[in-house]
């Protein structure tokens, strides 16, 4: 029934006057309700759309398209960290999610990696003024870098020497972040500080990866990424202007933890004013690399140590209970990065058509003490055209000894000088750490023994 109140002329009776008042009141309330409905129409439609897609995906429909999901407070996920952890979602208590899913269907861990890695590259860009990239696995970086140009050697060991497009600064940052620890970066989540361009998308498409987050994507770059993984590659766009609440919360075993966000600025010159070592000289490049190291550690599971050289992390030791184990783990990764530049490694005669992952694995074994696993008769023919010579222990030690100018950051103080002894073996000449150990004197003496310049920042960077 449609009521035309303008044409209605009821008899002037008390009963009809009550009817008229009822219709006017009902019509006014309905208009108010419709206005509120229209105000939230987009959000309601999107949430219903997401719920339908999520339920269909959870019920086994793998052809559900999650692209162009935006303007929402909540996104239901297939499951949490593990398939048995249901239900799962990400949501905002206030406002809308600062992301858009442009392609794919990211999962719980994908979003953890995406949001942690985005903070890292955003902060690197703000601190250095250069495009930055990170490669994340299990909520810690495997690599992080800024967009310095690549030498021919780095292009070769990062497997980008055959790319036909000119590498942009962002593409160089990505190649460095992905290439530093290729074994750990396998199946990573990528973060980019700047709009993803064709050159960067071209490099990403070649690697085994779960997804990428960036403030934007050129149409051509987005099309390249949409073709990856048979159209299921996860592409997330984030609002670069988004600022989270300064107070953050998390739950453990039903108990809610609350703390202020870690918003310490790590490009503050004051961080390098307390230098207790005899060598007090930090070059501009060393300060830049130490800043990169500290920012990387800020988003790495503790305990953590990070070796940096020429604008990129070359060894990250994450999540170890012992500080010396962090230093050893990260140092070993830095040594492998450096050994990959040895002439014997760069000239390995791989068979034609070897897959990138197989090449990575073969190099890793060839460099290690288990080199016979790829060099024994009946095995080497699977990887090489001819049997390579062994890279001897003496050759490896001599090559590693040539590495110089490495910067090292730690997310907390070094308790003993053994960390410095190990760092020195991997070419460390500059260190930034919190200080405050009862054995600071031992740590300082060990630095002086090798002429290492060390700054006490007074800042702890635990991340859990």
Question: What positions do the PLM features span?
Answer:
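Acidic, Ala/Val/Gly-enriched low-complexity intrinsically disordered segments
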Residues: 6-7, 12-14, 21-24, 45
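Gly-rich Lys/Arg/Thr-decorated short loops/hinges at beta-loop-alpha junctions or inter-strand turns
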Residues: 93-105, 180-186, 260-280, 357-379, ...
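Glycine- and Gly-Pro-enriched alpha-helical subdomains that act as flexible
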Residues: 142-182, 314-413
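Short, positively charged and aromatic/hydrophobic N-terminal segments
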Residues: 4, 25-28, 32, 39, ...
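Flexible, glycine/charged-enriched surface loops at secondary-structure junctions
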Residues: 127-135, 235-238, 302-309, 339-350, ...
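Active-site-proximal loop/turn and secondary-structure-junction residues that shape catalytic pockets
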Residues: 140, 196, 309-312, 320, ...
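Active-site loops and adjacent core secondary-structure elements that bind or stabilize anionic groups
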Residues: 47-270, 286-304
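C-terminal binding/interaction regions
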Residues: 192-193, 206-227, 231-234, 242, ...
